[in-house]
């Protein structure tokens, strides 16, 4: 079995004000699920216009490697936001196995928090380290405004940290902006207004098809070559270009309503976007629909930059875009390279470990259970 330590890529640092003589009034951190440097290089011919053209104009790029395995969950988001590893920040996956309830529980589950517009109860209370937003608050004080907008609840809360004014994410079931009661502001008024406006439903009802002839894509699958691809956004909303569009529109609505970046107190806005399509089996581009996701991302970032330039001025803000690994390489890609591929079964591993420990230490339930890539012993 190949045990790869993925490189966590801070793949693009887009400094809009190249080396600004004054401190930017607004900093925007954009985490893009599945975005990699290799994909950006492959897609470069498409960047004659749009936000990602800044790669070759005003961007500084760097990479960072974190010494822990990537399991496809939000442990990487937590590492990015805290600057430390799961052993210290406490977020090792999306779920953990509860010894008391004997079942998987969302890693950020909090019975003290209520969902606003959603039934799930989540909060950042179990993040053990300070996050970027926490440090920002301690450094800038209460006058700084901090918001996070995302596609998944765990990612959005991890970006918001303990100290944000508010956060909101797009609920996969209701197609509404929702949040947690943990943050003092609750659901931002701009999010509630978009929920009521019908804008989300309007975009969700649209059909997603290739934006150009399928022969012009570099990586169409055999199926796509024959029939292209078609998705109804409502069914796969969080994995279509519309999801990114809605996050960008929400960000701009929030910037306008809260006047982010207008006064001299630096504000912080964090966004989660994605390049992963409904059929993505890998972070690497393996289909036309994944290429189309990158084209949509480029367009949405371009719109964000255009609007911010008009509203607050190019020198008054900066954007950092970070690629977050999620799926790594697909099984087919690894096998193509003649690498041995096996799958870890947590339940089987837990059973075998329990049998082994009983043979050594006596008949007792030494293993409580397993979930994901982890097994849980009966004591810490």
Regions found by a protein language model. Give the residues of each.
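His/Asp/Glu-rich, glycine-adjacent segments
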Residues: 84-85, 90-265, 274-281
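Bacterial N-terminal signal peptides
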Residues: 6-17
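Mature N-terminal segment immediately following signal peptide/propeptide cleavage
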Residues: 21-43, 53, 61
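Secreted, luminal/periplasmic, and some membrane-associated catalytic domains
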Residues: 32, 94-121, 129, 162, ...
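Loop/turn elements at helix/coil->beta-strand transitions in domains of secreted/extracellular proteins
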Residues: 23-28, 58-62, 88, 141-146, ...
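Second-shell loop/turn segments in exported
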Residues: 36-42, 65-67, 118-124, 235-241, ...
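A long, amphipathic alpha-helix that forms part
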Residues: 39, 47, 237-263, 269, ...
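Short, structured active-site-proximal loop/turn typified by the sulfatase FGly-forming signature C/S-X-P-X-R
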Residues: 40-89, 145-149
